[in-house]
Design a protein with these regions (language model features):
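Conserved "HGTGT" condensation-loop signature of ketosynthase/thiolase-family condensing enzymes
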Residues: 1-157, 177-180
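Internal active-site segments that recognize and position negatively charged phosphoryl groups
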Residues: 174
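Acyl-CoA/ACP chain-elongation machinery
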Residues: 185-193
Length: 193
């Protein structure tokens, strides 16, 4: 069996150090830390009160209001990074065979923010089991890969890797192998949390 050559043609990222590859890489070279005080919730009862959060995140810069409400922040981050990678690669303009382009994305937990919101609302409510109809679609670990595929019309291999902190690495390896063994011509891969 002849193995296909695999190359990286585009990259994207949305991190505490930068919201794109150039700003991330620049901060990395300068030794900047992405850690800071937790701002997403009241952490005063916890011993650790710092985390690596994406600062100044505004979903409306990337999604319309309706779409943003249907996506957990983890999926928003992954989709934005994937858009950057697809744009840099020129894949969308290359008119690929959409049946031969896939998406494999990793997430250790998935929509934890959504889970926390829904459970908190339930616990503080009147006891009636009312949940947002988008609760499950927002929090499942494969919604990021699915959304990226739907956005571009990719119909190749599509799934999520869930293997704790190794999720994104496993997703990248699976995407590499999909190309290497001829199951796809191009793959969008990475991870989000």
């Amino acid at each position: 069996m002849e193995l296909n050559r695999v190359v990286i043609t585009g990259m994207g990222c949305l991190t505490p150090l930068g919201k794109d590859v150039p700003s991330f890489f620049d901060a990395l070279k300068r030794g900047v830390s992405g850690a800071g005080p937790i701002t997403r919730f009241d952490a005063s009862k916890f011993k650790t009160q710092f985390a690596c959060e994406i600062k100044d995140w505004d979903p409306s810069e990337h999604f319309d209001r309706k779409e943003a409400r249907k996506l957990d922040p983890y999926a928003q981050y992954g989709i934005v990074a994937a858009r950057q990678a697809v744009a840099q690669s020129g894949l969308a303009e290359a008119n690929p065979d959409l049946d031969r382009v896939g998406v494999i994305f990793g997430s250790g937990i998935g929509g934890l923010f959504t889970f926390q919101q829904e459970i908190t609302a339930f616990a503080q409510g009147d006891g009636t089991p009312r949940f947002n109809p988008f609760f499950i679609p927002k929090m499942i670990g494969d919604i990021c890969a699915g959304h990226i595929s739907m956005e571009y019309g990719f119909r190749g291999p599509n799934y999520a890797c869930v293997s704790a902190c190794a999720s994104a690495t496993n997703a990248i390896i699976d995407a590499f192998n999909a190309i290497r063994y001829g199951k796809a011509d191009a793959m969008i891969s990475g991870g989000a949390e």
